[in-house]
UniProtKB/Swiss-Prot annotation:
Enzyme class: transferase
Cytoplasmic side: 1-26, 96-147, 233, 279-329
Active site residues per record: H210, H253, D257
Gene that specifies this protein: SLS3
Protein name as it appears in the record: Phosphatidylcholine:ceramide cholinephosphotransferase 3
Membrane topology classification: Multi-pass membrane protein
Protein family membership: Belongs to the sphingomyelin synthase family.
EC number(s) recorded for this UniProt protein: 2.7.8.27
An individual GO BP term: sphingomyelin biosynthetic process
GO cellular component: ciliary pocket; endoplasmic reticulum membrane; endosome; Golgi membrane; membrane; plasma membrane
Single GO MF descriptor: ethanolaminephosphotransferase activity
Side of membrane Extracellular, spans: 48-74, 169-211, 255-257
UniProt key word Transmembrane helix: yes
Length: 329
């Protein structure tokens, strides 16, 4: 049995493991991780579909939310529309965060090839931060994306395990006569490409994937949307609450599916946190060893600016100058 090298137990080894990867590298690698997790979830959804109890034999479980809310079939379509709206709003917010970053580092506002009155100013102007301004603006867009995508990947990976472990009877009308999956590979690919909208899957009840992405958008705008405009918080909160109602009212998920997803998403987003180094170092361990998809050293980081530092050599007694790169924080 091989004995681990002594240096693994030394402080220097763990210091190297804690050294943050470049933010750009984290963006690329964690996005790749998210795609891999999406395929894992797609396979888990297929297994869950095959293991789902027969609706003709097993009836839906008692649910207080079902008893309090009148059933409105098809309301889940409105939840999908709300998710689409929040997707667009989050992309817009991320772009505005990028403009705040450019403003912080002294870059000018980008310009369109042709100036369109009103439109250019709305999209390309810097909306100066008025709330949550304790967050450093440098690289805020990159850090926000890393926080969002790592939280999403963790939640989907855990959901892949949970939906396979226990099979619940489907409460929605669409899964009372579940269709047969004829081409499993095609169904997996469609699940990833359409985020589940164009594939066949029933029985993936604990916990709600729709609620995960809704709550992620809610948390994203609660923290970062307020930096762009004060109205983003109340607007996204109302949209998210209405979407939760649509999910339960359409019987798309049990009420517990929604409540558990809300709790897990909020807890995960808070645990990942906002840090100038990107994701927590424990999560960076999973991508640190990759031989591709970005550099492993932060010696030259994005948006770094050279600073001249003079120091005196004690050995030679002469002054020398070196150019070092300011850390990208």
């Amino acid at each position: 049995m091989a004995v681990p090298p002594v240096e693994m137990y030394s402080g220097s080894f763990w210091n190297r493991m804690r050294k943050p990867l470049p933010l750009r590298t984290q963006v690329i690698r964690f996005t790749v991780v998210f795609v891999i997790v999406s395929f894992i979830l797609a396979v888990a959804l297929q297994i869950t579909h095959e293991r789902m109890p027969d609706p003709k034999v097993t009836k839906p479980l008692p649910d207080l939310g079902f008893e309090l809310l009148t059933k409105v079939p098809g309301m889940y379509v409105l939840a999908d529309c709300c998710i689409g709206f929040l997707n667009i709003l989050s992309v817009f917010t991320a772009f505005k965060l990028y403009l705040l970053h450019r403003h912080c580092v002294g870059s000018g506002e980008p310009e369109l090839p042709c100036n369109i009155p009103g439109v250019s100013r709305f999209f390309l102007s810097v909306w100066l931060c008025k709330e949550n301004c304790r967050i450093e603006l440098r690289n805020v867009h990159t850090i926000a994306w890393i926080r969002f995508i790592t939280s999403y990947a963790l939640l989907l990976l855990f959901r892949s395990v949970v939906i396979v472990m226990t099979s619940f009877p489907a409460p929605d009308d669409l899964c009372q006569n579940p269709p047969k999956i004829e081409n499993p590979v095609k169904n997996v690919i469609l699940t990833v490409l359409t985020a589940g909208g164009g594939s066949i899957h029933c029985g993936d009840l604990m916990y709600s994937g729709h609620t995960v992405i809704l709550t992620l958008h809610l948390m994203f705008h609660w923290i970062y949307g307020a930096m762009v405009h004060w109205s983003f918080r109340p607007v996204v909160t109302v949209v998210a609450i209405f979407s939760y109602y649509c999910i339960v009212a359409s019987r798309f998920h049990y009420t517990d599916d929604v409540l558990v997803a809300i709790y897990l998403t909020i807890a995960t987003f808070i645990a990942v946190g906002h840090n100038a180094d990107g994701a927590p170092w424990q999560l960076q361990l999973f991508i640190r060893w990759w031989p591709c998809c970005g550099a492993n050293s932060r010696e030259m980081t994005e948006d770094s600016q050279p600073v001249m530092v003079a120091f005196k050599s004690e050995a030679a007694g002469q002054s020398s100058r070196k150019v070092v790169d300011e850390r990208n924080h």
